[in-house]
């Protein structure tokens, strides 16, 4: 830039000084001998301004404010502004030309370093680029700019106009022209940037792929995904938010993935059915084939030189030489039997696939139906519970005025066999009645039987067993584990409160859920080390519930736990049918009574023995 300024200053001096100075300059510009020629500074180098140019600029700056807006075109101020605008155009043109030459040099280096097969293509691209022309880098200058008075041409090429005299149409045209030039410049700069990244990547100085190549590959991937997912995003992609686009993509992926998952599950189910069918066929073949192999016919066996109706163990493994015909008939019978069983098994599998409900009702024996109907009747269990509740209530009311407390003498009687009447009524009558009513229709859910063995089980007595029964105490233990009771009871704050007898919750009431978890934890802690039965643990829990007057609330928590009731109770059970409401009403008769029952009665003697040793 400074070199261009130094080159443009003599022109300005010629316009300001006059003909005499012009003649002197022409004399100075006479060609010098080659030995005395002065070498010019390179383009873009910094050059110091000469004293004459500095004085001229100061003088022009001093004259510029004095120029009137309506001064004629040949006034010094307007001439100075025009020369400055021309100087800016020359600077921009020189910069564009230098950039163009640099691009040509860059492409020439690509041609030289390129492969022989690529040189022809690079030369054609160089030719196209060389004749394309330099980009127009002049920005749009507003109407108030001094350079806008003369436009883009030289002085005298266009009529002199004021900015306010220009029409709106001319302004719009100039703006549109400027925008087009800017677009062309941006496009050319992008092309040059892509070429530079490509060359740097080929030379090894750029690690990642060029941005244009990355965008092209990403576009290919996105287009293929859109085709595979059957999505139409060309219309409303601009109006959708990021979350809406994500939801559309998830929905499209789900349409493809979900059927595949269903097919995989169906294939796994069919594999399981086929595997179970093969096991069933092998089982029946073993049952049917064993009589054929050990059938009671007359056979001749050479075992110790004796012939008889039976065969000894040493001679049974040998094949008699005269029984080849009998063996062929046996093999034929086995094949026919196997084919018959295969047809029956396929028929059963087809029925199962159609019905999906296992055996028909007509295949159930009448005696079994009567027995099941008898088991479903829970009215005797309710009567037994009512009788036990009334007996416990009578015994408790009889001992209420005396504050039923287990003393040391009573404890000695208990250990020696003299049982307390109220305690025995609670443990042997009330707890058993509650246990039987809770166990009505209760079973342990097990995924052991496959889908194929369910309908086939009715054909074989060995597979027609009822679901495995479950003890009601296990229901309380499952509730304890489901509610993470161990973490609640063994928390540091609760341990400290138990050690120092301080309330944890700051005086708030303990909920039934918290008290139930604590009670189950205490029963498990005391009874599990001594391997006590589930009945003993349930009796201890009932005694603790009566002592705390929470029997109804604790049982109600189990009844309201849907995650335990649904998978462990039959639809015809008392729990699923009535929700245990009538039983809770019966047990509520004991809620107002105070009890002080021993909880560790089943492990007290064992604890004493352990303490003794």
Curated annotation (Swiss-Prot):
SUPFAM superfamilies given in the database record: RUN domain-like
Coiled coil: 160-235
Record field: compositional bias (Polar residues): 309-325
Keywords, sorted A to Z: Coiled coil, Phosphoprotein
Domain RUN: 421-602
InterPro entries to which the protein is assigned, alphabetical: Run_dom, Run_dom_sf
GO biological process, one term: in utero embryonic development
Pfam families listed in its UniProt record: RUN
Protein source organism: Homo sapiens (Human)
PANTHER family to which the protein is assigned, alphabetical: RUN DOMAIN-CONTAINING PROTEIN 1, SORTING NEXIN-29-RELATED
Sites bearing Phosphothreonine, chain numbering: 54
Lineage of origin: Eukaryota, Metazoa, Chordata, Craniata, Vertebrata
List of residues that carry Phosphoserine: 71, 75, 497
Biased composition (Basic and acidic residues): 159-177
Protein name, entry field: RUN domain-containing protein 1
Region of interest (Disordered), residue spans: 15-36, 57-79, 140-177, 305-330
Protein task: May play a role as p53/TP53 inhibitor and thus may have oncogenic activity.
Domain of life: Eukaryota
Compositional bias annotation for Low complexity: 57-69
